Design a protein with these regions (language model features):
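Short, hydrophobic/aliphatic alpha-helical segments
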Residues: 1-9, 95-101
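Amphipathic alpha-helical segments in well-ordered regions
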Residues: 4, 26-27, 125
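Gly/Pro-rich interdomain helix-loop hinge
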Residues: 8-91, 131-132
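Short, amphipathic C-terminal "tail helix"
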Residues: 88-133
Length: 133
């Protein structure tokens, strides 16, 4: 995802690390619908000392901790907060989503994704809405 958005918008380059940090909580929530990935994320949360009474609670704690780090590091929570213009986002998102699905790194994702779903995920990242699919 970060590869395909870095230089896609006129409002400025999104550096690779910043994009990864911004996208990570959303991607974890998307991938956590895969049972194997969910177990792994919950284990990461446990091993880093986070608390939760269930796998889902541990994953939420992990995402919350990443969000807290991002605030400390002054990393925007959304693409909108980064300064991407909504009209430009809407104009380009279908192509960006299609290109992101075709990126070599996407093939190693624990949960398969198609262009329409990638577009939904990017839309969550733009507006800061919950990943519930």
């Amino acid at each position: 995802m970060a590869h395909k958005t870095g230089a896609a918008f006129s409002t400025g380059h999104i550096t690779h690390g910043l994009a990864n940090a911004m996208y990570l909580p959303y991607v974890i929530k998307y991938n956590a619908k895969d049972p194997v990935a969910a177990k792994r994320y919950a284990e990461i949360a446990r091993r880093t000392g986070l608390e939760g009474v269930s796998e889902r609670a541990l994953i939420n704690s992990l995402c919350k901790k990443i969000d807290e780090f991002n605030v400390i590091l002054v990393i925007p929570a959304t693409l909108k907060d980064f300064g991407i213009i909504e009209e430009e986002f809407k104009e380009k998102i279908a192509t960006i989503a299609e290109n992101a699905v075709g990126d070599a790194c996407t093939g190693s994702n624990p949960r398969p994704i198609d262009p329409a779903t990638m577009e939904k995920l990017f839309t969550c990242i733009y507006y800061g809405t919950e990943v519930d699919f």
